Amino acid sequence: MQILKNDWHELLKDEFEQEYYQQLRKHLIQEYRTRTIYPDMYDIFNALHFTSYQDVKVVILGQDPYHGPNQAHGLSFSVKPGVPAPPSLQNIFKELQSDLGCRIPNHGYLKKWAEQGVLLLNTSLTVRAGQANSHAQIGWHQFTDKVIAALSQRQDPVVFILWGKNAQAKQSIIGSQHFIIKSVHPSPLSAHAGFFGSKPFSKANNFLVSQGKEPIDWQIEDI
């Protein structure tokens, strides 16, 4: 069965045959059967489904999915419509307001970004309910490193937004032709130590315009 439905399939199909992925898959089947795991198994690869390889302009790298009920749906930092924005996302919206004057929306569903070429990728694609980082060591990093490496091989520059140490650890995979924006994580624990005031959204758009590309419309409308 073909797991990925767009141009990511050609780039990543060999990964699904690798021994590490077979082990990861077995582990996940058991986990989904016996525990509460987020996101829903049909949403695991949504970041890749919502934003095709060819369309990627910006990557926002997260850590692992939200681990509360009804939050995670496969896009980093995003929550399903109708679910209150978690604290990190509230801080992202505050910075977006101060950076570009965008109104803070009444929800945290970031599909509009994904549809414009913002790949919202977590480094681990699943998590146990209530246990942050619980799937960090089961093989996802190997898979998501391949995703980052595939983008890095593009001559066409991509903006990589790396918030926090986990995301910044991936910098070594990213080629020098790409534009990297770094700061501390938007979590309430660190946002005041350099996330607020870092202006990642205007920096990303300025770079895209300098490359002759359409900037991202970061404003999320109310629903």
From Swiss-Prot:
Claim: Hydrolase is one of the keywords in the record: yes
Entry keyword Lyase: no
GO cellular component entries: cytoplasm
Keywords recorded for this protein, A-Z: Cytoplasm, DNA damage, DNA repair, Hydrolase
Signal sequence, renumbered to the chain: none
E.C. number(s) listed in UniProt: 3.2.2.27
Catalytically driven reaction(s): Hydrolyzes single-stranded DNA or mismatched double-stranded DNA and polynucleotides, releasing free uracil
Principal location class: cytoplasm
Enzyme class, UniProt record, top EC level: hydrolase
Active-site residues per Swiss-Prot or TrEMBL entry: D64 (proton acceptor)
Biological-process GO terms, alphabetical: base-excision repair, AP site formation via deaminated base removal
Domain of life according to the entry: Bacteria
InterPro entries attached to this UniProt entry: UDG_fam1, Ura-DNA_Glyclase_AS, Uracil-DNA_glycosylase-like, Uracil-DNA_glycosylase-like_sf
Subcellular location: Cytoplasm
One protein family per Pfam: UDG
Gene Ontology MF term list: uracil DNA N-glycosylase activity
Family: Belongs to the uracil-DNA glycosylase (UDG) superfamily. UNG family.
NCBIfam families linked: PRK05254.1-1 (NF003588), PRK05254.1-2 (NF003589), PRK05254.1-4 (NF003591), PRK05254.1-5 (NF003592), ung (TIGR00628)
Function: Excises uracil residues from the DNA which can arise as a result of misincorporation of dUMP residues by DNA polymerase or due to deamination of cytosine.
PANTHER family given in the database record: URACIL-DNA GLYCOSYLASE
HAMAP family on file: UDG
Protein name, entry field: Uracil-DNA glycosylase
Taxonomic path: Bacteria, Bacillati, Bacillota, Clostridia, Eubacteriales
Gene name as annotated: ung
